[in-house]
Amino acid sequence: MSIKSGEAHTLDERFDRIVSIGMFEHVGVKNDREYFTIARRCLNDNGLFVPHTISGNITGNHTNAWIDRYIFPNSVIPSAAQVSQAVEGQFVIEDWHNFGADYARTLMAWRANFDAAWPRLSSRYDERFRRMWHFYLDSTCANFETRGLHVWQLVLSPGGVRGGYVAPR
């Protein structure tokens, strides 16, 4: 196993497996298709690409103004239509797993860890930051609980897995 970190468009290697965690929502709508094109170029013919992304129910090219300003500048939460359009003609969708309902618990665990660490952090961060971080975690948790946001993990193959892909769940 090798782990590569850096600018994907400069890679000139091929891999059996590529995993991309939390990247797609940050490439920008105009780069959606290129993101998958680069993955395809770097993947062996019998390889698998596993993109993991936060996602939403509505197609758009913007995000919440507060999130854009304070948390994830220039991010866009992709819809199923946007993902499908970017993948079309490049990959076979072998599996599309939505585990967003579980993510609310993750956010609340982060909040609990943050609160437990606050006595050590408070010398570096002010009360305004603490309130903003709580707002981010709590509001995002609510979006996952009400199913407005999701976490998707896809398994994509260049030409289809012979005999079909079996998801290990």
Predicted regions, residues:
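Conserved SAM-binding strand-loop segment of SAM-dependent methyltransferases
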Residues: 1-8
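Conserved Rossmann-like nucleotide-binding pocket used by diverse enzymes
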Residues: 4, 19, 50
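A short acidic, Gly/Pro-enriched loop at the edge of an enzyme's catalytic core
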Residues: 9-19
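Active-site micro-motifs of SAM-dependent methyltransferase domains
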Residues: 10, 25, 56
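A short SAM/SAH-binding and catalytic strip from SAM-dependent methyltransferases
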Residues: 17-30
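A short glycine-rich, Lys/Arg-flanked "PGG" loop and its adjoining helix->strand segment in the class I
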Residues: 33-48
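Substrate-binding/catalytic lobe of Class I Rossmann-like enzymes that use SAM or dcSAM, i.e.
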Residues: 54-169
